[in-house]
Amino acid sequence: LYLNTMTVEDRKEVRPYYYKTQMEKIKGIHAQITGNPQTRFTIEELSSMYEIPLTTMKKCFKDVYGDSIYSYQKRYRMNLAANMLLQDKAKEIQEIASCLGYENPGKFSSAFRSVMGLSPVEYRFRKGEILDGK
């Protein structure tokens, strides 16, 4: 029993190593996504634009930002939409969808619900009431 406790290793998370050039490319990809929320980039486009192998890009991005590129991009856009819904209540949902690159408001509503748990209309109503103190 004593020997078993002596051989137990601390299980520390091993962080992968990435080259500086890879990290710069991943930061560039992040800036591309956050700077252009109206555009839905495919991973193939990003890989080509930043000249980084697809597998390396996907793994590195997830290790750095904690989510896949697709999920990060979607969550980022829906958080922007949530802010827009509450900041400008006169702006129509279709207009917000269009600002974020969605041509179909139904697809936007579906994406919004999958991230926020409420439709854009419900979100605006419920969160707006909380902010207004009602």
Locate predicted features.
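Extended amphipathic alpha-helical coiled-coil/heptad-repeat regions
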Residues: M116, V121, F125-E129
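Terminal helix-turn-helix DNA-binding modules in bacterial transcription factors
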Residues: K27-G35, R40-E45, D63-E103, R126-K134
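Short, Lys/Arg-enriched, Trp-marked, Pro/Gly-tolerant hinge/linker segments that flank
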Residues: L1-A31, G35, D63, D67-S68
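Short hydrophobic/aromatic patch on the recognition helix
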Residues: M57, F61, K107-F108, F112
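Key DNA-contact positions within bacterial/archaeal DNA-binding proteins
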Residues: T55, P105-G106, V121
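Residues within the alpha-helical elements of helix-turn-helix
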Residues: M49, C99-L100, V115
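Conserved mid-sequence domains
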Residues: N36, P53-K58
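Helix-turn-helix
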Residues: E45-I52
